[in-house]
Amino acid sequence: METMSYENRIALGNLVPTLGQFKVMDKIPQYQQCEVHNLVEAPAEVPEVLRHVVFNIERGQTLHETIDFLNMCPELKNMDIIYANELDDGAVRSGNCNVAYEIAKSIGMNYAYGLEFIELVNPDDNKGFHGNALFSRWPIRWAKVVHMPEQYNWYYDRQKRIGARVAIVCSLDIGGREVGAVSVHLENRADSEGREAQMAVVYDEIRRSFAPDTPVMIGGDLNTNTFDGNDIPGFTALFNDPERLAKHMAAVEKYERVLPQAEENGFSYREFSSIEGTRRKPMPGGKSMLLKLDWLMARGMECVDHGTISTETKDCTWAEPGSALAKFTGPELSDHNACWADCRFAK
C-alpha cells in the first residue's frame, strides 16, 4: 500500500473528533483497498485434508523468529491457510517493514492484506499501517475488506489510531473448487453484544459473496474474553478468582454470543477449535491471565483433528540450531498461541 506522510496522518487524525472514524477512513484510499499477491504456483494435487491455522502475530515484533516458527514447527509443516491478525506495515516496532509480505515470501505462500489501523503515535513510522492478513498455498481469486461496526474509538486510546476492526474475506481456488476463507479480528474493548454486532456484518458479507453450498472457514482472534474489555475492575476481579475464571474458560459460549451466533448462521466451531487457552493477557505483578480468544469455525467442512501450539520460547525445542528462533531469548514470540485444524470437505 502507498505510504502517507506523518504530517498527513496527523492532519487526518485531527478530523476524527469532529467527523468520526468512518468519515475520516472514507478520505483514505488505503482503507478501500485489499492487497492480493499470488506469489507461488498452486500445488499439483489437492490433499484429502487441508490444515487451517489461526495466528495472532502480535504486530510482527519478532518477525525473524516468527518466520522460523512457521517454517520449522513440525505441526505447521503442511499448513495450507493461515488466518493472521495484527500485522504491521511500516512501523518502527516491527522494523518498518511489510510484515505480511516478508512472511509470505519466506514461507512460500500467497497473501491478502487489509488495513485496520493507522498508528499516529510514532513519527518515525514509515507508514504506521496495521491490519489483518490471510496466507494461502492456494491461489487467491479475490479478496475484500469488511469494516465492522465501531465498538471502541481507538483515537482516544494511548495507542492513538485512525481506523476500525476489519475482516478479510477471500475466495480461494483449491483445485478448481471455490472455498471461502475469512480472517477476522473482533474488538477486545467491547462486550459480548458488541462483538456479536461485528460478526453479524461478516455473515452478511459471506451470504452476499458465496453461494450457500460453498465451503467457508472463518478464523481469527475473536477476543472472546467473556467480559467487557473496558471493565478493568471487572476482569481484574475475575483474574483474582481462579475458580470463577476456570468456569468462564470452560464455557465461553455462555458468556460470548459470537459462538452460538456462529451455529445460528450455519457454522460449526466446537469440533474445529480446542478448548485450551490461546492468549496470555498481561496482568499486574508480571502475571498473566490465560484466555480462549482464537477460533476456527466452518460450514461445508468436517474436522479430522485440531490442536494448539505454544508460542512460548521454552516450548520451541525443535528450533534449528543457529536459527533466529534458537537464539531468541525473549519469553514468547507472540502473546497468542497458534491454533490449527485439519479439515476435509463435507460429503
What do the predicted segments below correspond to?
Residues L50-I57, L70-N96, F135, C170, ...:
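Active-site beta-strand/loop signature of hydrolases that rely on acidic residues for catalysis
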